[in-house]
């Protein structure tokens, strides 16, 4: 089950109370104070783990709390610290305040550990309150309460390449033949109901991650179809690959324009992202010479449109996932784009 958003209350542990205690030994009838301190409450810590892929472990849970600190004891024994609660989440998880929508944490790297809520401090035992005018203090501090916060955990997949296209255009077939992902494939719309990640090995030394996002339909940015719920996942991809289907009644140019408009409505930043275009099912030209000519005209119209909008950054390639033609060229094209983006990112962060 793919769970990508959960609402939950998180609370760190309360500090244990300090002890009120006095020495009780033979021949010492009025022993001084020996109350120990309370233990600190446990912390809430987020841990990013790429072996975890969804937020399903949080499903159905309304509240998670770290352990409270133990109370102090006599003979100056301090209470034990409460156990921390470590929450394991997949890469791409954001922790968002439900009331303000502020992003509190953004977990993007394997092994990343972030302290989220600090446990309450334990109270001081009565030993600390002995002074010249009060040799036998009969009070100690209570522990400080832990922190509590209502948050929403949201998972946005992190990938190098995000596949963008209408339902049933060949995205799942593509990712199944170029990567280790095994999505469900069938000849009907919305086969892909959840995002899928696949590792694409280009050669012995180079690879990248590709994301198959459920198909977008016109109006997805307004909530139609399955697209809106998963458009956010495309935000975490570095490069977009539009997958267009020559077998659809809608011309290739129109497919591209509609898809781009949906991205623009959802996010201006996403609209301006670098992209490539893949014409899928190139083996369909075998359906006849007339059909092949129509596809060629369609592609030419799209190519001219790309020149009109002055977008020299994009590439256009024909691929058949079934016959495995054009796949090698596509992988190397994508790798070059990703390398450029990675290098630019390094330059920006120096």
Swiss-Prot record:
SUPFAM superfamilies: Obg GTP-binding protein N-terminal domain, P-loop containing nucleoside triphosphate hydrolases. Residues 1-158 form the Obg domain. GO terms for biological process: ribosome biogenesis. Its cofactor is Mg(2+). GTP binds at residues 165-172, 190-194, 212-215, 280-283, 320-322. It is found in: Cytoplasm. Residues 159-339 form the OBG-type G domain. Mg(2+) binds at residues 172, 192. Its EC number is 3.6.5.-. Its main location: cytoplasm. One of its GO terms (molecular function) is GTP binding. InterPro entries: G_OBG, GTP-bd, GTP-bd_Obg/CgtA, GTP1-OBG_CS, GTP1_OBG_dom, GTP1_OBG_dom_sf, OBG_GTPase, P-loop_NTPase. NCBIfam families: Obg_CgtA (TIGR02729), PRK12297.1 (NF008955), PRK12299.1 (NF008956). An essential GTPase which binds GTP, GDP and possibly (p)ppGpp with moderate affinity, with high nucleotide exchange rates and a fairly low GTP hydrolysis rate. Plays a role in control of the cell cycle, stress response, ribosome biogenesis and in those bacteria that undergo differentiation, in morphogenesis control. This is GTPase Obg. It comes from Campylobacter jejuni (strain RM1221).
């Amino acid at each position: 089950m793919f769970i990508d958003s959960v609402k939950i209350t998180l609370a760190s542990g309360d500090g244990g109370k300090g002890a009120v205690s006095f020495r009780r030994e033979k021949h010492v009838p009025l022993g001084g104070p020996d109350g120990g301190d309370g233990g600190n409450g446990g912390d809430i810590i987020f841990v990013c783990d790429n072996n975890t892929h969804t937020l399903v472990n949080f499903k159905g849970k309304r509240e998670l709390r770290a352990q409270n600190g133990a109370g102090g004891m006599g003979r100056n024994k301090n209470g034990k610290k409460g156990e921390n609660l470590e929450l394991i989440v997949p890469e791409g998880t954001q922790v968002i305040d439900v009331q303000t929508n502020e992003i509190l944490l953004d977990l993007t790297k394997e092994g990343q550990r972030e302290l989220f809520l600090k446990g309450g401090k334990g109270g001081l035992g009565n030993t600390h309150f002995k002074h010249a005018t009060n040799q036998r203090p009969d009070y100690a501090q209570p522990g400080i309460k832990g922190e509590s916060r209502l948050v929403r955990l949201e998972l946005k997949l992190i990938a190098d390449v995000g596949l963008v296209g209408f339902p049933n255009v060949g995205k799942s077939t593509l990712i199944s033949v170029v990567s280790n992902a095994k999505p469900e494939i069938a000849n009907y719309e919305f086969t892909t109901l959840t995002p899928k990640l696949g590792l694409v090995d280009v050669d012995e030394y180079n690879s990248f991650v590709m994301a198959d996002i459920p198909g977008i339909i016109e109006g997805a940015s307004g909530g139609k179809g399955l697209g809106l719920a998963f458009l956010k996942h495309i935000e975490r991809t570095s490069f977009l690959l539009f997958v267009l289907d020559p077998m659809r009644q809608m011309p290739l140019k129109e497919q591209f324009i509609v898809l781009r408009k949906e991205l623009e409505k959802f996010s201006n930043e996403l609209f301006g992202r670098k992209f490539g275009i893949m014409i899928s099912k190139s083996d369909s030209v075998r359906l006849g010479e007339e059909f092949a000519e129509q596809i060629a005209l369609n592609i030419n119209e799209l190519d001219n449109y790309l020149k009109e909008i002055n977008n020299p950054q994009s590439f256009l390639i024909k691929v058949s996932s079934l016959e495995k033609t054009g796949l090698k060229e596509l992988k190397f094209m994508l790798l070059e784009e990703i390398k450029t983006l990675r290098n630019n990112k390094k330059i920006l962060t120096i």
